[in-house]
């Protein structure tokens, strides 16, 4: 991809998504929640970042195996056929990017175990979940900044995703959390997102301007039904990266 970009004189920004574990003393009795962070414009040859991403990738596969083992326990109780190693390999063949529960859900639909992805989560994947590899906000920031990049808080108000909504639905409270506990490690905030409404976008833009943060946006297109390129993001967002 980078070679083709250079060959056709296309400007690009390197990017990676990192999942972190975050807790706040005022919410959920300090129980940690999962949040997504975005690293932009980093050196893809940075060895520390490469090493960590490899560890995360290897952990994801082990996590998937553990989730399937738990699902097998449930399937056995229901007198249904358990997943095999061949099933795991078949799921892996469908993965384009990071291996996660949505890929298992899709496979369960394909095998006729459930009628749709949501039922896969409701009946099996929530109950059989295994925690993701714990990475702190500080560690993620040091990795990305150490590679010359910028760390951005992904979709902070996504009602359906790994976001601050897990702590509070109030955007005002979300901004308070960011200001109190996250600002030293953040360079920006993702304002435009498929599940951010106009009011949410405006609130995040105002907050970012006040705190001197970069503003970014993305469709969060990991798979269907979300389509890449369907979100209208101003050109000045890319210009912030001095391309």
Regions flagged by a language model, labelled:
Residues 1-96, 184, 190-234:
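A metal-dependent hydrolase metal-coordination microenvironment
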Residues 172-190, 230-243:
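Structural recognition of alpha->loop->beta junctions
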Residues 122, 153-156, 187-191:
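Short beta-strands and strand-loop turn motifs
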Residues 1, 129-133, 159-169, 192-200:
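Acidic-and-aromatic substrate-binding clefts and catalytic sites of carbohydrate-active enzymes
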Residues 133-179:
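Conserved, well-ordered alpha-helix/loop/beta-strand core segments that scaffold catalytic motifs
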Residues 68-143:
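Hydrophobic, aromatic-enriched interface-forming segments
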Residues 39-41, 108, 155:
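Short, structured patches in soluble enzyme cores that scaffold and shape functional sites
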